[in-house]
Each structure stands twice: as structure tokens, then as C-alpha cells.
Amino acid sequence: QKIPAKQDVLGWDLSTLNADDLTFLNTLLGEGEVSVRIQQADGRASEIQESIFCGIWRVRCQNDLGQWEEHLEAGSAPRALWQAATITTLPDDSLLPPPVDGLMNGLTLAQELLAHVRDPATQPHSINLTQLPVSDADRQFLSRLCGEGRIQIRTIGYGESQIDATALRHVWHVRCLDTLKGLLLESYEICPLPELVQAAPEDLRDSLQRLDEVCGWLASGPPA
């Protein structure tokens, strides 16, 4: 009965549920549009699946022994995702890779990207490669600058979006795909967490209402 504020998360440990109860809960919650895979630096992993109730997340995390622990969370995004999104490198110009043949706007875009990463007051900021004259060399230059992060996000809806964290703090590589037309949009998003991943407050309110209806239906018992 509470809508958590942005970056606040409500959590419930599912370790006390028996196998039947856990199966029932998973069936009830289903699978929503967002799935996340996080690979920690120490080798541990987290797997996150949004439920059909937007903003309700099923989270599986490995503990220090490598065992999987499951819990349920409610919020705009799960706690593990907020935490992992900050464990990256703050850049300086020394990170710029050497220029390569075929560069058009790659160096200018790289300097723009680094400037916004260094100044959180200018975030969020988007560099939409789809709407800019960029070459394959530009894309490779930006990819080498940003490196690979430890978070992979997939969303499904009208199409599929692939959102990958880079090795730079608050820099995300976003690609929106269409099964027939291929790549629709490619961008670098500079922000703590892309809005595309987060459940909006109105989505959380809608989920609360729907869960209230489900709880009422369960409490009423089977029909006579």
C-alpha cells in the first residue's frame, strides 16, 4: 500500500516460501517487458525480470557462496540495478582512443559525451547516432572510448531494445530494433538509468490497483 519514491525500493525475501508457493507466485506475476543481467566484478551475477505488474521485479542474486537467493522488489527499478549503475569509471580526456581512418564526427561526439559525464548537472543527455552523420569508424571510436560494462538490459514492447551499460559511469548504449526493419535507433544515453527501463509513477499506481484487485479475488476464495 505504498508507492516508493524514485530510487527507493521495497523488498520481500522469498527464501521462506516452499516450492509450491514460489511456483504459484511466479505464475501469478508472469513476465513483463524488462529483463536484466548483471555480472559483478567478483564473478557473482544477478538476474532480474519485471513482472506483468509494471514496477514489480523478481530478482535472483548470487551470494558469496555462489548460491542463488530470490526476492521480490517494488520500485521504479530494482535495487541491484541502481547500485550496479554507479560502479563504473569517471572519465577524463586521457581515455580518448587514438584517431582512426574514416573519422567524421567521432572525436567531437566523444568530447561531448565526456563533458556531460563529468558534469551531472547536464544530465540526462542523449547523443542520437541515428540522426547524425556518423561513419562506421565513428561508431568504433565511440565504442572503444566507452568500453563494455557489466549490465545488459532487454526490453520488449512494440519492438525490442537492447540497453548495455558501458565502462563509463552513467553512459548507456541503446539500440532499438524492429524485427522487419532492423535497427531503428542507436544512441548513447548519459544518465543514472535510462527512462526506458524505469517504471513511471503512474505505472506503479496502476500496478498497485491491479494487485489490490488480484488480492481481493484471492481472498474471496473459489466460486461456490
Region locations from a protein language model:
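Surface-exposed beta-loop interaction hotspot
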Residues: 63-126
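C-terminal structured domains
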Residues: 158-224
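N-terminal/domain-start segments enriched in small and hydrophobic, helix-friendly residues
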Residues: 2-15, 50, 55, 92, ...
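Extended intrinsically disordered, low-complexity coil regions enriched in Ser, Thr, Gly, Ala
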Residues: 15-38, 132-154
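An acidic-aromatic pocket/loop used at catalytic or ligand-binding sites
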Residues: 58-87, 180-207
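Surface-exposed interaction/gating patches
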Residues: 2-9, 99-150
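Short, structured protein-protein interaction patches enriched in aromatics and acidic/basic residues
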Residues: 11-19, 34-58, 62, 151-181
